[in-house]
Amino acid sequence: MSPSANFSHFLLIILALLKGFPYLKGIESANVVAENYSIRVASQSSARVHEDEKETRISEALNPVLVLDNTVTVRELLKEDPFSQWTYRSRWSELSDLELTSDSMSKAIQAGKASRLKRVLLKALAGKKINVVIVGGSNSAGGKLGVDERSLDGLYFNVFTKWWNETIAKATNAFVKEYGVTIGGTGSYVFAFCYKTFIPRDLDIDIVLIEASINFNIRGKAEPLEQLTRQVLSYPSAPAVFYINLVSGLGLDPTTQKVINPLCTNLENFRQAELAHHYGISSFSLKEVLCRKKDEGWEAAVTNLAGSDGRHIGIKAHAQVAMMIIEHVRGVFKEVINDVTNNVNANEIASLALPELFFLKSKTEALSDPLCWTGLTPNVYQSRQRSNLKLDVIESKGFYRKGGSKTGQYSDGNNKTDLRTDAQGGWTAWNDHSILKLRILVPPLNSRTIPESRSVIVVAHTSGYGGEAKLWLDDNKDRAIYVDSKANFGNNLLNTVATRVDPGYHVVTVQTLRWGMFMVSGLFVGPPDFNRREVL
């Protein structure tokens, strides 16, 4: 085969790997491009095709020579020991330093389908920027690292992206940019409704890290995570998705000096692994490292890697998770390089179609074009939330708008930021008989298979000094729901006010019933039959 034929064959392999690749903005479907290019090569035509502009755009999006050069360089990088590359090489230089073994690592890294990640890594070989979104709770927002380490550099995703930028990116120029959507006391449902409103419009997301194994409750179990997963997987750029499965409370309670969570309970107790398998998600389980199986359950085995509060994970546990992600990405990267260098065509082209529902019982409960207004924020220093719900306050008696203070508050209500930027916020009242009326526009649900009506949901923030309120829609006071926001921990719980709501303008009324803080931290519009109470 001539050199020119080899080059043409190589380009076809790259295009085949990129079939359906949504990152190539400004060009037609990569599938069509690959077919058109294949026809031209097969015909051996010397005539120039009158599509110079399209071919220019293709070359701008994908430079095969650059991909080949970067493949050679990255292959050599992947031969090196990752412990010699990462930021902790002088502190933890081998698995045993992290209290890990090859066996525990293999159990902790639970690989899913790699096709989406492979396309991201091929994009990196082409020198394109990689966008990573982190969705999670207080551990991802910083936990106690700011207090214990005086820095948030040790967050698991920061360690991973620093490794990437100092190794892969230096060779390819494919630097990672992070977008944090991390808020303490917040579970998967809030993120399923709202995560898009916290990132730039039309952002090409490449990888999403979902840390949701701690912030859940028994009412919802893993169903909220399924809703979030479906929302992320259906994002236009078809990102690769990882579950970051942490465990809270593996330290000692400062008062009792006993392990707070001795049974290592997290969302993995409630069929999260089955959910990951159903959707082909790769998971990284801290439970497999810090806990051990006993009879039919689990028990805490390593209790010295928690933060100073005994609840959040400490810096070494963050490092363990980071190394899991690094090892997984390295392994898949080696497969991609083998595919490219050996001219192996990609037989598995990732389908963007979602599989059937798993925990959800009906499509009329599954989120589709959800609308979100929220006073929560992952960063009090940036006004990033782009509410997609039209909302007006038409009456406020005793309620005031509480936003996150820059000198601020922790998400759990403490008055010290500890370098964290996440904060609670919303419409807040302390006195009884306070009234809040919010006028919202409920648009029709554009679907051929389910009704165009919607559901209306209020998010209330719980606290140890929480109040109580009744909530209703329009004039339906006789159908009011009652929400008690007093709880041991500060969480953001969803409560459906009404289902099968016709399109148009509607008014949500909140009336407090006793003294205490009642905070409306969010207002959502969901699918017709989304009827949930006190889910996280």
What are these regions (language model features)?
Residues M1-A30:
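N-terminal signal-anchor transmembrane helix specifying type II single-pass membrane topology
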Residues Q85-G180, C194-D204, I450, V456-W472, ...:
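Serine-esterase "nucleophile elbow" of acetyl-processing enzymes
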Residues P503-Y505, L513-L536:
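Exposed low-complexity, polar/acidic, P/S/T/G-rich flexible segments that act as propeptides
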Residues V133, G280, E299-L360:
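Histidine-centered active-site loop/cap adjacent to the catalytic His
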Residues T87, D339-T449, D529-L536:
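Glycan-recognition and processing domains
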Residues S115-V120, S188-P200, E223-Q231, L267-R271:
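Alpha-helical scaffolding within the catalytic cores
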Residues S96-L100, N139, L145, K177-K196, ...:
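Cell-envelope and extracellular/periplasmic
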Residues G249-E288:
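Substrate-gating cap/lid alpha-helix
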